[in-house]
């Protein structure tokens, strides 16, 4: 597949996701999403869509994976560059900034589906472990002097807080998210300054 074909396939995939989201917002039921209707709206064949997606659930699963893979790539670059405790703290904070910056206008719906559709829930649970592992590494390197028990307890709590934060922030207007993000980051930093525990 050449560059032009790849670009077209990415564009089509994005359009399919957008049409599926629009259909879901309108009909409120995932069962109402139709490959035939989406194909007709986009003026493509059903085969074009099924070459990317096996089921309607697969549309949302792949969108979820795409978003998180992009976020992890960005985060991993920041972690790889880190050398000092300050660098690791920065990589910790940058993750939250990037997460909020890249939330789509349909983030609320994607979040709800990640907690509802079986394959999306499986991916979410697997990804949660990956996120926690990175929090653990960053807490250990960014706030040195803590013992392993404290690091594990803090990384577990930060993970729980982060997923609660996600549930909240996807449901508020985009122009209000930066204030919530700032408060959330300040709260985490205050907690993580304690070497014994919160």
Identify the function of each model-found stretch.
Residues 89, 93, 97, 129-140, ...:
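An amphipathic alpha-helix signature
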Residues 15, 24, 58-70, 123-127:
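Alpha-helical DNA-contacting segments of helix-turn-helix folds
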Residues 142-188, 198:
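Hydrophobic/aromatic-rich alpha-helical bundle segments in the mid-to-C-terminal region
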Residues 100-122, 167, 171:
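Amphipathic alpha-helical segments used for helix-helix packing
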Residues 102, 118-144, 152-156:
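Amphipathic alpha-helical packing segments from all-alpha helical-bundle domains
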Residues 15, 26-58, 62:
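Helix-turn-helix
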Residues 62, 76-105:
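Hydrophobic alpha-helical connector segments
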Residues 1-29, 37:
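Basic, helix-initiating cap at the start of DNA-binding domains
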């Amino acid at each position: 597949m050449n560059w032009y074909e790849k670009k077209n396939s990415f564009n089509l995939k994005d359009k399919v996701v957008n049409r599926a989201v629009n259909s879901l917002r309108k009909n409120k039921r995932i069962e109402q999403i139709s490959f035939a209707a989406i194909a007709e709206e986009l003026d493509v064949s059903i085969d074009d869509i099924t070459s990317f997606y096996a089921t309607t659930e697969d549309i949302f699963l792949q969108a979820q994976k795409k978003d998180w893979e992009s976020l992890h790539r960005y985060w991993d670059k920041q972690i790889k560059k880190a050398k000092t405790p300050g660098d690791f703290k920065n990589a910790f904070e940058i993750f939250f900034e990037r997460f909020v910056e890249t939330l789509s206008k349909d983030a609320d719906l994607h979040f709800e589906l990640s907690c509802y559709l079986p394959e999306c829930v499986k991916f979410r649970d697997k990804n949660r472990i990956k996120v926690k592992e990175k929090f653990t590494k960053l807490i250990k390197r960014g706030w040195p002097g803590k013992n392993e028990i404290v690091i594990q307890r803090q990384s577990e709590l930060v993970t729980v807080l982060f997923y609660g934060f996600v549930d909240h922030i996807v449901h508020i207007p985009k122009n209000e998210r930066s204030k919530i993000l700032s408060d959330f980051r300040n709260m985490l930093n205050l907690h993580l300054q304690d070497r014994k525990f919160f």
